[in-house]
Amino acid sequence: WIVMRDRHGVAHFTINDHQRVHQCGKFGLCGICGKPLGKHVKGNSNKGAFFVGGPASFYHDRGAFLDPPLHRECAEYAIRVCPYIANPSYGKRIDDATLKPEHMPAGMAVMQTGGNPPNLDTRPNVFILGLARRWEMFEPRPGVILFKVPNHRRDWVHLSAWRHGVELDVESREVKDEIFRRLMAAATGGV
């Protein structure tokens, strides 16, 4: 639902529609289907909402997500079919290279969120699907909307690791914790 569409209606899956991302955060809508997540997803509820991202988004003190919260079914769909996440041989640039300036919708501009666009060199080797009790939307600078979980040590209810669109078979909580500790160390350079 947040995928940017050009003047001809062509979807550009590597570009988010800023207005829709904002609507998701403000009104509690799923970033994939655009339907309400339900009143239980904000605040201190135990129900929560799902996020997909690399280990640093989940475990780093400043970790955040570009994509808004999702329904469980929508999150699992995304983690299974998104080429950047699920396809190990995906080799395209992950930025605005697919959008011709003359096809941009009226009144819309494409801006990078900072640094180089994600590419195969920066793609995590494992992605995480997480259920958060609470989440917040914030705008660190005009035009950039991010989502974060207030207390990443306490607010994650469930986490699962995925590689190439398949959930990793990890049985015990102790093994999961060790895997996530190692993933976080790798994602932050051992910090």
PLM region spans:
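A structural/positional concept
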Residues: 2-8, 27, 33
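Short Cys/His-rich Zn2+-coordinating modules
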Residues: 4-19, 51-57
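Short, flexible, mixed-charge glycine/proline-rich loop motifs
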Residues: 13-27, 61-65
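Short cysteine-rich clusters marking metal-coordination/redox-active sites
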Residues: 30-34, 71-74
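Short, flexible beta-strand-to-coil junctions
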Residues: 34-35, 45, 54-56, 132
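Short, non-ligating residues that shape and space the ligands of small metal-coordination modules
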Residues: 37-43, 47, 80-81
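Short linker/helix segments within small regulatory modules
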Residues: 54-68
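Domain-exit/linker segments immediately C-terminal to small folded modules
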Residues: 64-191
